[in-house]
Amino acid sequence: VRVVDLHVRSTSTAKARIDAIKSDLVRLPLQMNLSAERHFAMVYCDGVSASEGFLMQAWYASARFPCLAVGGSAGGTMDMKATYIGTREGVLREKALVIFCEMARGMSFAPFKSQNYEATEHSWLVAEADPVARTVKSVFDRHHQPIPIIDALCQHFHCNKDQLASRLDGFTFGVRVGSEFFTPTTVDGEAPSTK
């Protein structure tokens, strides 16, 4: 079991955060020789820290772990102000917990992915975003012009800004990479500004 600092407060750019996490991963002590055949890593990441992508970029950039990483984000309390991951040493915040697992000889494993989401017919291409703050400022409209995300959502749902939060009820946002969808933790339940 290893704890990885997500460098939420000590870095201000995506590159700086990835580099800091990678540096920690390179120095992470291991007590086993990892292999893709017998090992996997269970990863629990502070979802409110908006660092899942940074952690995995650093993970692969370190080229240190030749095994499958499985797991996900711990969401936190309903107000989405903090995530608390419990360990024997105490409660973790702004950290990831990595558990390296070894299968018994002769045993195997296979990952599966399950999400309870269905894609809608409408999507937007992000024009401007901040991956550190996990905010979207603008998307491209059908004329390929950037417009504020809130305006795009209001146009889509035929509502004004005051009605938007209620119109978004039952929906979540996802990012498509190839044929896979990734659904980041939403930050709050209030009417969105740029989040």
Which role does the model predict for each range below?
Residues 1-195:
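Small-residue-enriched flexible segments
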